Regions:
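Zn-dependent metallo-beta-lactamase
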Residues: 1-48
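Accessory terminal helices/loops
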Residues: 2, 215-220, 227-286
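Metallo-beta-lactamase
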Residues: 4, 112-238, 246, ...
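Pre-active-site segment of Zn-dependent metallo-hydrolases
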Residues: 24-25, 29-38, 48-78
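Divalent metal-coordination and catalytic microenvironments
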Residues: 44, 54, 69, 83, ...
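Active-site neighborhood of phospho(di)ester-bond hydrolases with catalytic His/Asp-centered motifs
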Residues: 53-56, 77-85, 105-108, 181-184, ...
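Active-site metal-binding motif and surrounding structural segment of the metallo-beta-lactamase
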Residues: 60-106
Length: 286
């Protein structure tokens, strides 16, 4: 657990990380030991109450997440979803079955993305074939957040609009009293970025989003996808930014998706989930 005193009342946070199989599985041979992705869910809590940032994807991982929260003994008041990708909100129903009074909220634009991701058509086309029997049949969606901040025992938790990062209409959650940013997928921590939804303009917008996070001067930055053993140092802001710059440069000077993929692996040989890079390379080069 991590603790920093603020206004004589300690706020704390802890991070639940679960590994699963990545989305892209048709990539070239090699790097088999790295063909996994890990998603993070962050619990921010005070003396009695707690706020969760992002859920997990699969039923089993969300049951484990719910049990982990219950073990903390805290009263879960809010589930904040940073953006509309399914692996960040498909656990809402599972969590509410154990914490029925918790409200799941997100920004209005993020809620719209959720409804696309969780539609029967998108489930049948994209998610269910990749994770058969592992996902909720009828995902529950977040409600639109009506206020500018979330209150937690006298502390303000502020959603920050970031625009496009690994998808459209993303946010982070800033807790200024403890110097914490829960970055969602705006920052990655030793895992290949998902750039398949980001064209050249989108990548510029993602860098601008990282500048926005950096301007908050956080002491801790929790990435939506992180290697469990890695710490949450703010250096991951620049690491993510440099990865995008490198991808941009190599995308301009590579002729094929395979060439771009191989050249990025030369720069980043040890990052987890090369399948994400494979998808990104194909989106950039066809």
């Amino acid at each position: 657990m991590n603790e920093i005193a603020s206004n004589n009342i300690p706020l704390k946070w802890d991070v639940f990380v679960a590994k699963r199989q990545g989305i892209s599985r048709d990539l070239p041979p090699g790097k088999e030991q790295l063909m996994w992705v890990a998603g993070s869910s962050t619990l921010i809590y005070g003396v009695r109450d707690a706020v969760l940032v992002d859920t997990q994807l699969t039923i089993d991982h969300n049951r484990a997440l719910a049990a982990w929260i219950a073990k903390s003994g805290k009263n879960l008041t809010t589930i904040y979803i940073t953006h509309g990708h399914a692996d960040h909100f498909f656990g809402i129903a599972e969590l509410k079955s154990l914490f029925p009074n918790a409200k799941a909220v997100a920004t209005p634009t993020a809620v719209k993305v959720m409804h696309r991701q969780g539609s029967p058509e998108y489930l049948a086309k994209f998610w269910t074939p990749r994770y058969p029997g592992q996902l909720p049949a009828n995902p529950m969606f977040a409600e639109e957040l009506k206020s500018k901040v979330i209150q937690l025992e006298g502390h303000e938790l502020a959603p920050i609009e970031l625009g496009h990062t690994d998808t459209d209409h993303t946010t982070c959650l800033h807790v200024p009293s403890i110097g914490l940013v829960v970055a969602g997928d705006a920052a990655y921590n030793d895992i290949h970025l998902y750039l398949a939804e980001s064209n050249e303009q989108g990548r510029r917008e993602w860098i601008a989003a990282l500048d926005t996070i950096e301007a908050l001067k956080p002491r801790t930055v929790i990435a939506g996808h992180k290697v469990p053993e890695r710490d949450d140092d703010p250096r991951i802001i620049e690491e993510t930014r440099q990865y995008i710059r490198d991808f941009d440069e190599l995308a301009r000077t590579s002729d094929t998706a395979r060439e771009l993929y191989d050249r990025m692996l030369e720069l980043y040989p040890n990052r987890a989930n090369p399948g994400s890079l494979w998808s990104s390379a194909h989106a950039a080069k066809g």
